Amino acid sequence: IEECVGTNEHTLNEMVAFCKAKKWKPLFVIPPMSSKLQRKFSDEFVEKVLLSVVNKSSRLNNIPLYNYLKQEDFCYDYKLYCDGGFKLNKYGSKKFMRHFLGDLIKDGIIANNSVLSVDKL
């Protein structure tokens, strides 16, 4: 697992460097996962393989992180998924994007305007 984590960290750092070179402002988004699927992974595994790498890069590079992994609006509503918990279906995606765009507007990352509006989703 250590090698995998190191590879993930290296790849993420390359992606961040690429964005910075292009003058882009990246942000990290961890999408929701159903509670049934979450039970398949220990908290220690999720922390070590995913969260520690993303949290570290977010902190070191001052990149906003939106972690919806255990978002209750999504975790227990299994009809939002098309595959049991990893992939949101059409309705789940629409609900997630409304929530996510609302957070981006609330945090001042994007403006709520007529071109990009939560209400249009």
Where are the predicted features?
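Short amphipathic alpha-helical patches
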Residues: 39-43, 81, 120
